[in-house]
Amino acid sequence: MNSFARLNRIMGWVMFAIALAVYTLTLEQSVSLWDCGEFASAAYRLQVVHPPGAPLFLMVGRLFSLMASSPEMVGFWINMLSAAASAGCVMFTFWITTYFAERMVDDDNKNKLLLVLGAGTVAALTNTFIDSFWFSAVESEVYAMSSFFTALTFWAVLRWWKAADDAGADRWLVFIAFMIGLALGTHMLNLLVIPTVCLAYYFRKFPVTRNGIILALGASGLALGFVMKIVYPGIPWLLATMDRIFVNDLGQSFYSGSIAAVVLILALSAYLMHYTYKTGRRNWNVIVMAAFFVVFGYSSYAMVIIRSMANPAIDM
């Protein structure tokens, strides 16, 4: 690892520490107005909040609540989830900025290291102290974790861009898809990264033309449609429909149809991954794997169904 890479990594973590310290010192001690009390209460006992449910936020919030020494401290520790997620977003903002700054400053500039790291520091600290971001960083709302996933996903796009010609670069695309799927369990804001992924893939792999850009934008629209119209509403519909058929028409036990639907999705995904790999269709193999990991990340919504069956006090 060269000196720039080492300093870049260290400075990123320094930005994380500064942001986390600021947010911890200014953290809400309990709960604030609007949805924060609902999210904190639901995360504490893994209950079900208003649709669509934010299950990943609630499950991670539950882990943070375990650090509370008393029930009075639960709100504080779930707020700490937002502080940690926001600090992570600041760290990735630093690395995203230095990635671009390194390519903008000439190599023969004697002050390149200072300029690049300085640009990243300014961007990271600006993000740290900007008003709306700071507010979401100190309360138990979903926007902090959503911002973290957005920054992480965009950083992963840049990592793929840098390694696109390497043998194992496609793993970054699969990782991006998984992060998008996980982010659905927090907020749909992360879907805004999908057009960026499609355009980055086009600009990195193909000659740039007007028609090519139009096709790349069309592909991003199809990817958004897949998530918003097939994955998001389609999987619950498939589970409910198959369960109704298995129970009402075939006389099977409750949830047998839902289990069959999950097995069907896994079997179809495994077959398509195996088929595209064996036939040498590399691009299609990556597409199938990415689609599967979006669905896999989205599976956090099973928590909403499972916990709702327990009839918790908060069950929206």
Language model: regions and residue ranges:
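Start-transfer (signal-anchor) and selected internal transmembrane alpha helices
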Residues: 1-22, 88, 112-121, 261-297
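Membrane-interface transmembrane helices that cradle and orient dolichyl/undecaprenyl
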Residues: 101, 106-114, 153-173, 199-210, ...
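Short hydrophobic/aromatic helix or loop-helix immediately within or flanking a transmembrane segment
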Residues: 43-73, 80-84, 91
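Aromatic- and kink-enriched transmembrane "portal" helix at the membrane-lumen/periplasm boundary
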Residues: 26-28, 71-79, 104-113, 120-147, ...
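Extracytoplasmic catalytic/substrate-binding loops of multi-pass membrane glycan-assembly enzymes
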Residues: 27-39, 49-61, 314-316
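Short hydrophobic alpha-helices at membrane interfaces in multi-pass membrane enzymes
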Residues: 118-121, 156, 163-181, 210-222
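Transmembrane signal-anchor helices characteristic of membrane glycosylation enzymes that use polyprenol
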Residues: 6-33, 127-129, 187, 225-230, ...
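Transmembrane-helix motifs of polytopic, lipid-linked glycan transferases
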Residues: 13, 80-109, 152-159
